[in-house]
Curated annotation (Swiss-Prot):
Predominant location category: cytoplasm
UniProt comment concerning the protein's domains: Consists of three domains: the N-terminal catalytic domain, the editing domain and the C-terminal anticodon-binding domain.
Species name: Brevibacillus brevis (strain 47 / JCM 6285 / NBRC 100599)
Name this polypeptide is given: Proline--tRNA ligase
Catalysed reaction, written as an equation: tRNA(Pro) + L-proline + ATP = L-prolyl-tRNA(Pro) + AMP + diphosphate
Amino acid sequence: MKQSQMLIPTLREVPSDAEIASHKLLLRAGMARQLASGIYTYLPLALRSLHKIQAIVREEMNNAGGQELLMPAMQPAELWHQTGRWDVYGPELVRLRDRHDRPFALGPTHEEVITSLVRDEINSYKKLPINLYQIQTKFRDEVRPRFGLIRCREFIMKDAYSFDTSQDGLDRNFQAMYDAYTNIFTRVGLNFRAVEADAGAIGGKGTYEFMALCDIGEDTIAYSEEGDFAANLEKAEVVYKPSAKPATEAPAREKLHTPGIKTIDQLVQALQIEAKQIIKSLIYRVDDKLVMVLVRGDHEINEVKLKNLYDATIVGLASEADIVSVTGAPAGFVGPVGIDPEKVDIIADNFVQDVYDGVVGANETDYHLTHVVAGRDFTVSKYADLRNITEGDECPRTGGVIKFARGVEVGHVFKLGTKYSTAMGATYLDENGRSQPMIMGCYGIGVSRTIAAVIEQNNDENGIIWPVSVAPFHVHVIPVNVKVEEQRQASEQITEALRKAGIEVLFDDRPERAGVKFKDADLIGLPLRITVSDKAAQEGTVEVRIRKNGETHDVKLDQLVDEVKGILSRVDQTGAALFGN
């Protein structure tokens, strides 16, 4: 492909609204342009890479037994009402009405649509199991689109849905998808980890997120180097081992005047104590119930664990009016002592049991209580794992030490069970003629997000460094001076020879200075650059440069095709077949 004929509008300056490397480079390398906040046009180079990612996804999905279809993006609200998600999903769901005033949504996901389809078309165990997938544009009205293709309002996603007659069948499909995802993200060149996760708004039990590791990731991953444990912060279990009780009982509690001191940091400074001696008390509204949650002052409440403990739909901090009605005091001076259990549940994180001489709010403005002990001074209805894991905690699997990393979610696999099939009446007749709900799994990949994650992990100060498997082209052929006939002819011959060998070539035939073309080549980041100078005619050699490490090789023209194939195979780390015959 001649570069002069392609739309590749490279930029020298970094766009002011681009925050991260992948966003900057997608814009500077002429691969994407923003139409509106969180909405992008994919230009020819980016689209070539997207198509390659999609081809890898299709190959692995088909190998795992998936069947591709394509569902509508526009979904009737009626389906979402059947599952109850129309009211639960929130403002991220793009809602609209047609000319007949009928409500619809632009799909962020397709559980309702696929369940409706399978419900209407499959009614016997003989037609199960089945795994159906699509690659399609999705919509989500993000409150704050950011980081380019990492968090968009319109994005490309692969979503798959399996339907089984048994839990064992679901487990097999789930493992097949897990293995397929591992192959996909390995082949596209990502450094990733599969981490235990919470199912969130999708619902279901048993889920893993596939995280591309990078510093700009919005998610924190807890992992241990001693084994294969990895989980996101929402899911990571905290190991609790009771500490030894002190030999002496804490003194009787005292009321202390603490004017204007509301935060943990302020209490630590004012009382000259450690944060772990404070019992932090927060009041939540869990669905229609008020709950006081206690956690040690140096820990943070995990709202996902709280939601799961109550099997709740909605969890959020209580209003100031609710807090005052329960405690008589504003937030910052709230505590468990003297609280009426008829008005509010009192639950606590496991580690609150280790606070034997603690500080809590006195339920009175500008006052706290000291020398407080759980069990003696207040009663907890239930202890549970309710806090975020922290670095240095014990790994729940291996006993090793927990460390943190940042990651971008590029894939997610769920065991949905019968959540959607029961709600929507997706049943089949078993061997005995009895009606049973189908058992479902759900499996998503952010295709457009993956391209951003690949760039985020593969770049330097000069531009993108594409992995061979998803590069827009394999080789960039650049004549130093395209006006020199010998250089042009040699470049055209090289391009054609490589093309016939199944190697994809971008031929920079523009009448630009060599320095400009080299800068653009580094910015675009194709795996190999072949520089054609006068030496091509005089000595029969060209320079081959590896983008990944900057190595250069002088290669004879009659050996060039084989040498390029060999270098590309060595540079590629996925072990995939790269070229045709």
